[in-house]
């Protein structure tokens, strides 16, 4: 089948960063519970779940809305800090730049649909120069209005002007695929 457009997930697909998320959640867990997360918690409670849900888990459901927002933002600040500190692996996956260049050269429309928040998307645009290939306003991110990742993919398809049946999606998360 010929694909006429492409949608990429970002984290875990174009940029390998899971270790930074784990470190950031460890910091939040230490603040809220006085201990780090366990591997079991990571795999059964935290991976692929929204920040707010994780914060409620750490606080036994007792975090106020203000605390949820505060610690969600704090987690992402830690995450960005850990990304910047790891200069060896703070880059797009090998071959991505060349593939993006190829897609641009061939006129194949593409964009990113990520569960990341706007602050992280802005960070990625600036750090990786994503605006060389994709207009920042065409990147779909978690602004709180999408029911699930599939809804984000549909919005991304609208943005690039290609019917979903003609799009190839690169997604690494089972939760992103199952939705």
Residues of each region from the PLM?
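A general structural motif
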Residues: 1-3, 107, 164-166
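Active-site flanking residues adjacent to catalytic metal/cofactor-binding acidic residues
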Residues: 8, 170-171
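N-terminal helical cap/lid subdomain that shapes the substrate entry/recognition surface
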Residues: 3-94, 102, 106
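Hydrophobic packing residues within well-ordered alpha-helices of enzyme cores
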Residues: 25, 55, 96, 121-125, ...
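Alpha-helix N-cap/helix-start and coil->helix boundary motif
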Residues: 21-22, 48, 52, 97, ...
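Alpha-helical segments flanking ligand/cofactor-binding loops in enzyme cores
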Residues: 97, 101, 177-178
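Substrate-recognition "cap/lid" segment bordering the active-site pocket of phosphatases
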Residues: 89, 111, 117-168, 174-178
């Amino acid at each position: 089948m010929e694909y006429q457009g492409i949608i990429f997930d970002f984290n875990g697909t174009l940029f390998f960063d899971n270790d930074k998320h784990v470190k950031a959640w460890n910091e939040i867990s230490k603040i809220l519970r006085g201990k780090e997360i366990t591997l079991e918690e990571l795999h059964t409670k935290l991976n692929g779940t929204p920040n707010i849900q994780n914060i409620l888990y750490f606080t036994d459901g007792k975090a106020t809305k203000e605390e949820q927002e505060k610690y969600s933002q704090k987690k992402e600040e830690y995450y960005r800090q850990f990304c910047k500190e790891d200069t060896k692996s703070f880059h797009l996956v090998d071959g991505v730049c060349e593939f993006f260049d190829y897609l641009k050269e061939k006129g194949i429309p593409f964009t990113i649909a990520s569960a990341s928040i706007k602050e992280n998307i802005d960070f990625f645009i600036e750090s990786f120069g994503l605006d060389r290939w994709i207009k920042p306003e065409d990147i779909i991110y978690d602004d709180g209005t999408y029911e699930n990742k599939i809804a984000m993919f549909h919005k991304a398809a609208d943005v690039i002007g290609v019917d979903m049946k003609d799009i190839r999606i690169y997604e690494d998360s089972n939760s992103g695929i199952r939705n």
